[in-house]
């Protein structure tokens, strides 16, 4: 909440999808945020990550090779890194200004290898972080409508006063007027 710039998320694979979701959630309540895919970063997209921004990198292993160029870019420009991993000795956490160490969990399923439990835990962590940020910035329904005017949520938040025509904008005709004219 003290970030002077944008909150940028990155991650590869399932971690990237969680980062994209977390970014979308933050944007929906007014925190400027977006997702940069790590494979696009070394091809020009790293230019969207600026000195005042905060870069949140998510990687269960913390050693995902595709993230190295993003870490290097952040280090080169003095961009703060918040690293989220389940590996205390990871490259990611070694290069992070703020370290989020999530517990290692056993993946459910027949192989025990498909990211299921770990992705659920990571998504839950970032949803809880979003709720804490909403509380810190005193987020309310009246602020939510400013960023989320569409869909079912937007319809639920709109008031009649926001959508009804008023005053001389009302299409009024005299009751004696001919309908065909």
Regions found by a protein language model. Name each.
Residues 1-2:
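An N-terminal, well-structured beta->alpha segment
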Residues 6-137:
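Glycine-rich phosphate-binding loops that contact phosphosugars or nucleotide phosphates
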Residues 94, 108, 135-165:
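Internal, active-site/partner-interface "lid" segment
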Residues 167-170:
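Short, solvent-exposed beta-strand edge segments and adjacent coil->beta transition regions
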Residues 172-181:
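The conserved cystathionine-beta-synthase
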């Amino acid at each position: 909440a003290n970030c002077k710039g944008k909150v940028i998320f990155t991650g590869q694979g399932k971690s990237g999808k969680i980062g994209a979701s977390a970014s979308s959630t933050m944007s929906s309540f007014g925190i400027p945020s977006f997702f940069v895919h790590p494979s696009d970063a070394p091809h020009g997209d790293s230019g969207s990550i600026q000195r005042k921004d905060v870069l949140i990198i998510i990687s269960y292993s913390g050693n995902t090779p595709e993230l190295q160029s993003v870490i290097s870019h952040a280090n080169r420009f003095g961009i703060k890194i918040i690293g989220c991993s389940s590996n205390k000795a990871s490259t990611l956490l070694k290069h992070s200004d703020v370290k989020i160490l999530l517990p290692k969990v056993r993946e459910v399923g027949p192989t025990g290898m498909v990211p299921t439990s770990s992705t659920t835990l990571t998504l839950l962590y970032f949803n809880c972080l979003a709720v804490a940020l909403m509380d810190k910035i005193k987020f309310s329904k009246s602020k939510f409508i400013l960023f989320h005017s569409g869909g079912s949520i937007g319809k639920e938040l709109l008031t009649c006063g926001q959508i009804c025509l008023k005053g001389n904008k009302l299409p009024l005709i005299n009751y004696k007027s001919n309908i065909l004219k």
